[in-house]
């Protein structure tokens, strides 16, 4: 039996998504000993909410440990334009001295396969294992502004296997503080940007079946992960990460695997949950955008850019509006 340490972060707004995530973890990891660590800022969850997640976890055969982060524990970390809440996972090395590695999962995730192989990834002296992000393809100009080594492929921090033992060998708060001060105006994702800076040349890249953005063009996907790997990931995903501002619990979501989230929800105490934005207008809008999104995804990024130069500005803006951009 594989012992797997998993950290998640939540607040009162993420109780339902976190429960869906946990349900999916336990459904596909019955042969593994799972310990869930719940990261949350003091005051962001009620005692009843924390107890509810604990009961759910233990009822599925897992172990549970709450990790309440008090303001003084973040005192050594810098203020960012996004606040300190985005830096919670960086507290893990100091808070869990007895744990050498931990898998961190964002709340907008559904697990579809065992996590044992991912957790068994040989990190060596690397700080982290993570999946590649498309940012270097879409926004290559951001990398030097963020101080990211050009030989390092920027990763997405929604699914990361963290080498806590290696992280404890460096002064993480001090490094993050210096980084934030030097790149304050350009940081968009505080923990993700900082981790990419710190972990340059000490990152193990995961197969895209563990973390892949579905809403990208074919040429972007091929450049980021490789065409064969993308096909394999779509055919048999281990982790579905709903990257982007519109999540599957919104009726406006057009993600091709949004049904996986709702199916998993029905096997939780929140079965029958209705999206907060479930209105007739939003349903009609989504029904119109889904086929348009499918058509859009058939284009390559280079093809879109060429087409964009040919189309009148008003038509381009209308198409973007229809696609919800």
Spans of model-derived segments:
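A glycosyltransferase accessory/donor-loop signature
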Residues: 1-4, 10, 169-325
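Active-site-proximal specificity loops/subdomain of glycosyltransferases
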Residues: 49-50, 55-95
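Short, surface-exposed amphipathic charged segments that create phosphate/polyanion-binding patches used
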Residues: 76-86, 143-147, 220-225
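N-proximal low-complexity "stem/linker" segments adjacent to membrane-targeting elements
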Residues: 1-27
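GT-A fold catalytic core of metal-dependent nucleotide-sugar glycosyltransferases
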Residues: 66, 70-71, 85-138, 156-168
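Short internal beta-strands
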Residues: 34-42, 130-131
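A short, conserved beta-to-alpha structural element at the edge of catalytic cores
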Residues: 128-148, 254-255
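Short loop->beta transition adjacent to catalytic acidic/histidine clusters or analogous donor-positioning motifs
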Residues: 4, 29-37, 64
